[in-house]
Structures are given as C-alpha cells and as structure tokens.
C-alpha cells in the first residue's frame, strides 16, 4: 500500500489485489467489466496474466486498485510467486455454474497462505447471470466463507452487479487493517478554544470547574466539553487522592485512597478538614 507522492496524482491510496481461481471462472470478464481501467501489464508478453487498474471512491478517498490475474494454469505457479509479492488483498473467484471451481478453493487458499500469508481475502461467486445453471448453492458458499472468516459476494460482469461493491469492501478491510481508521471520519481541526478547554478539563475534575475564576458561560462550556470528550475518565476509575492533615507533625501529606463511586462536590455544610483533589 502506498500514498501519493505529489498532489497531482489522481488517487489517495494505491492497493494491489490478486484475482485467484481456476481457469474459465470469469476472472478476465471481471477485469473487462471495469470501463475506467487501464490494462498495461509488465507481464503481458507472457500471455497468461491479465492486469488492470481502476479507481474507486471509498468514504471520500480515491483508492487506486492494481488488479492482477493469472490464467490459472499450473505453469504460471512460479509467476504467481513473483507477482503475489506485495499484494494487499486477494479475491477468490469461482464459477457458480462450475462445482469443480468451488471445490478447488482450498487448493488456492493453501497457495496464498504459502506465498502471501495473512493477506485479507474475499470470496466471489462469479457469473450470477447463469443462476439457472447453478451448481454451487449460495448457502453452501456463504457457510464456506464464514468458516474462512471472509466476506462473500455473488457477482455478474454481464450485468455489472456487485463488481465495484466487492472491490470496495476488500479495500475497506485492507485499509482498516493498516489502521487507516480516519477514513469515513471528518478531518476536523481543533480550534484554539477547544485546545484550551481540553487542557483545562484534562487536569480539573468536573465539580471543581465551578470554582475556577472564569465567566459563568465559559465554565458551563468547560463542563459540557468535559462530559462530551470523556477526559475526566481517570477520576471515574475509582482512584483519587486525598489531602489529609497530620495532627502530630502539623503538616499536610498526600496519600492515595480508593473510592467506589465518582467524586462529587462536597456539601456546603461539610466540616471535614480534607477534600478531594486530582
């Protein structure tokens, strides 16, 4: 996975996906259905590898996908080892009208785990437009995907059904795995007031905010900010400090005590010579 090197590039993230499966399951049909893609493969002279790029929009981010596919022939196993290097996602493709292609998934998964272990995967049942010739029940494929812990789609390049959706879901899984969890969240720049509020409430319990020498409106905002942001969590964990006075040494000492509930404001008529502080 890579990010753009300059603002002129037309994408925010670059991902490499592999389409894996037996021959004649329609992997090339899936690639050909991508109208906006380009097909410039560095392995095109080998005649057994299809390559295409396309750009999808994921939560407002432009994600460019490099899609690689081999013909599924055994003589390309050595090539598979080479071009699987650096892959971020794998699309397991079978033909819903070809039972043998579905039963061969275990063989492909074993090969993937050998050359690209731990890479996120999705299972795709291709040629949904041939449902009248179906040999693989959807329920069986769904159960198989659940056993593998992967997402399952049935797609149709002829009807342009679920092609982009399946790519988008795999891209989402890959980006989340790489901890790019800012996708889908608005990039908000904190104001100076928010930064000041965060600093104050991080070291001041809620019940002591009212005692700060600040305008009433600002104190109210600070309490609301503290409740909303949860920055008072360390006071809620059942630990606090108590300032006690020693009668023998006539000096104050700070000792750690446990409380079983969140600290609250002491009553006005309290006669204790100690109070809770953070």
Swiss-Prot record:
A lipid is attached at residue 275 (S-geranylgeranyl cysteine). It is a lipid-anchor. GTP binds at residues 26-28, 72, 126-127. Residues 41-49 are annotated as: Switch-I. Disulfide bonds: none annotated. Expressed in brain, lung, heart, skeletal muscle, kidney and liver. Highest expression in brain. Expressed in fetal brain and kidney. Mg(2+) binds at residues 28, 69. Residues 72-88 are annotated as: Switch-II. It is an enzyme of class 3 (hydrolase). Its EC number is 3.6.5.2. A lipid is attached at residue 270 (S-palmitoyl cysteine). Belongs to the small GTPase superfamily. Rab family. The SOCS box contains two defined motifs including the BC box that recruits and binds Elongin BC complex, and the Cul box which interacts with the Cullin family of proteins to form a ECS (Elongin-Cullin-SOCS-box protein) E3 ubiquitin ligase complex. May act as substrate-recognition component of the ECS(RAB40) E3 ubiquitin ligase complex which mediates the ubiquitination and subsequent proteasomal degradation of target proteins. The Rab40 subfamily belongs to the Rab family that are key regulators of intracellular membrane trafficking, from the formation of transport vesicles to their fusion with membranes. Rabs cycle between an inactive GDP-bound form and an active GTP-bound form that is able to recruit to membranes different sets of downstream effectors directly responsible for vesicle formation, movement, tethering and fusion. This is Ras-related protein Rab-40A-like. It comes from Homo sapiens. The gene is RAB40AL.
């Amino acid at each position: 996975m890579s990010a753009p090197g300059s603002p002129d590039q037309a994408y925010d993230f670059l991902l490499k996906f592999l389409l894996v499966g037996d021959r004649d399951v329609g992997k090339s049909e899936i690639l050909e259905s991508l109208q906006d893609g380009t097909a410039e493969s560095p392995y095109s002279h080998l005649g057994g590898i299809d390559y295409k790029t396309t750009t999808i929009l994921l939560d407002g981010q432009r994600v460019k996908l490099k899609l690689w596919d081999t013909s599924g022939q055994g003589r390309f196993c050595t090539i598979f080892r080479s071009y699987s290097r650096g892959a971020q996602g794998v699309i397991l493709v079978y033909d819903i009208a070809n039972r043998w292609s579905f039963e061969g998934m275990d063989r492909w998964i074993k090969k993937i785990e050998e050359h690209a272990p731990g890479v996120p995967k999705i299972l795709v049942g291709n040629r949904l437009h041939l449902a009248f010739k179906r040999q693989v029940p959807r329920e069986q494929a769904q159960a198989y995907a659940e056993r593998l812990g992967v997402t399952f789609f049935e797609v149709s390049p002829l009807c342009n059904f679920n092609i982009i959706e399946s790519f988008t879901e795999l891209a989402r899984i890959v980006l989340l795995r790489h901890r790019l969890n800012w996708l889908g969240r608005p990039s908000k720049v904190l104001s100076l007031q928010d930064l000041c509020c965060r600093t104050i409430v991080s070291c001041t319990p809620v019940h002591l905010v009212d005692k700060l020498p600040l305008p009433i409106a600002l104190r109210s905002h600070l309490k609301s900010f503290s409740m909303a942001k949860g920055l008072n969590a360390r006071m809620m964990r059942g630990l606090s400090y108590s300032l006690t006075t020693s009668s023998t040494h006539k000096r104050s000492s700070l000792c750690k005590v446990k409380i079983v509930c969140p600290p609250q404001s002491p009553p006005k008529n309290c006669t204790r010579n100690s109070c809770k502080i953070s």
